[in-house]
Amino acid sequence: MAMAVFKAPLKGEFHGARKMEGKQYKHHLLQQQSTGRRRVFVQTDTGCVLGVELDRNDNVHTVKKRLQIAFNFPTEESSLTFGDMVLKNDLSAVRNDSPLLLKRNLMHRSSSTPCLSPTGNDLQRKDRSGPIEILSHSPCFLSLKQTANDIVKAMKMGVEPIPVNGGLGGAYYFRDEKGQSVAIVKPTDEEPFAPNNPKGFVGKALGQPGLKPSVRVGETGFREVAAYLLDYDHFANVPPTALVKITHSVFNVNDGMDGNKSREKKKLVSSKIASFQKFVPHDFDASDHGTSSFPVASVHRIGILDIRILNTDRHGGNLLVKKLDDGGVGRFGQVELIPIDHGLCLPETLEDPYFEWIHWPQASIPFSEEELDYIQSLDPVKDCEMLRRELPMIREACLRVLVLCTVFLKEAAVFGLCLAEIGEMMTREFRAGEEEPSELEMLCIEAKRLTTEQDVLSPKSDGEGETEFQFDIDYNELDSVYGSETETDEFFAKNPFSNGRSSLGELKESIAEEEEDDEEEAKLTLSLSKLSTSMKNNLSNTMGSGYLKPPKDNQTDKALVSHKSANVQLPLSVNFVKLADMKEVEWVVFLERFQELLYSAFAERKTMTLRNTQRLGTSCKF
């Protein structure tokens, strides 16, 4: 099987930005670099936000000092972080419009020290920005600038936002002068388990493992933006989305988080970092109606995006449906699908995705030529470059997941697999209530074994292969949730996870394990030929516990009744494969071995499909 060659990216700037706008953006970047002046947004791990103007002379100490003055926030035992990087003193790596996180060091997180939110004249004196500030000057977000302007005008006229009742996190409909919803805003500090969650799901600081351990609290916002940026030419119809700093009194601040015992007497103005998504009028969502009338092309396009970004939460509630015509009496007319809620995509490790479309008949229809051309035009390397440029806080671990899943998609499409087959290979199975690795994860396990084997047979010369991505910031927090080594041979050898839920405290106590002898590991290593689907049946006795998916919208009300903290509610999620522990040289070799293994895996999957002549969708006509 020929290796997929990464072709040039799609013609033109993403989302059809005009060339002149792109030139203006580059000129803006050059001007910022020459003057050294930048505007950044510093957020504490309790949710307080301050816009800060930097010049060449500023450093980490001066930024902390400003935060201390503005919020009465203790900064002695804290770290200023920028994505994967812990900033020591130099701020030269920090880009204009970047959000930074000031977090207390692990040993000091138990003492919850609130920050005092500036209000009224204090807020105006310490941060002179407007009510809504988009955290980028990229032409990708031009359409949202007008939306933001419309909202600001409405705010001045007294038009108030409307809190969204559904969901586990805080969200707000912001309206224009006519009172019509034009954007939905989700503050990062109101996510599930974040400090200011308005629905009782609290217990964690920003930057700690969240609803899914591989997606940290406060980091779903930039994932929403990443999904929009990766949806080139609006192929999957993701609504325009940006990160913003937004100020309003409607936002929730839990008691103690802003230094006030009660906010009932006077609603205080709060500044938040939030995702800002254009509101799309629609008639219902996919869970409200049968899916058989959904366009094949729309299902395929959304599925292609979900596979690329390893969406772990694609259910009917986050697929909006807009009717294009009535279809006549007794008929269902044409519809348009709008995918939303991408905050649980691009996890830091391979997770079990959730693709509700996987059993829809449309997913079993072969890709069209247009879809195949689109897939083959995707370039994961350039995707990563673009995301680093537009979302400099994104973690390298997330980008590795993007690269791996895009390579898998491209090779599978070339081989002739349909959307359902690709999705099934990425999805884990449960046997007797126990979770097994997906076929994709098994391929990764074997590719890592071959990479390690090549490393042993071809030792590096001194000084070679020293380059390594920055995964230094609190990656041990993810390890403490998953277990420091829960993959490959070691997992099969000695990790029979218990069934049921476990709190974070219990998980941390269960990760202390000794390493196996090399001889034992060699005996337990499984070759690819043994990792077939039939072999998986024999492995179920050694696999881990089941994984509980986030509740759908129609399950929200029951979930909200408990009001339990994160330590009680987080289930144990098994991690079979970790990509971030490889050095850059190892990562390149791993991808080569991974691609070499794909042909036989795809051939076996195709054989299985041909055996199943009664497969769902073969008799459907569209």
Curated annotation (Swiss-Prot):
Disulphide bridges, residue numbers: none
Catalytic loop: annotated span: 310-318
Domain Ubiquitin-like: 38-95
UniProt protein name: Phosphatidylinositol 4-kinase gamma 6
The organism of origin for this protein: Arabidopsis thaliana (Mouse-ear cress)
Function, as annotated: The phosphorylation of phosphatidylinositol (PI) to PI4P is the first committed step in the generation of phosphatidylinositol 4,5-bisphosphate (PIP2), a precursor of the second messenger inositol 1,4,5-trisphosphate (InsP3).
Keyword Protease attached: no
Gene Ontology MF annotations: 1-phosphatidylinositol 4-kinase activity; ATP binding
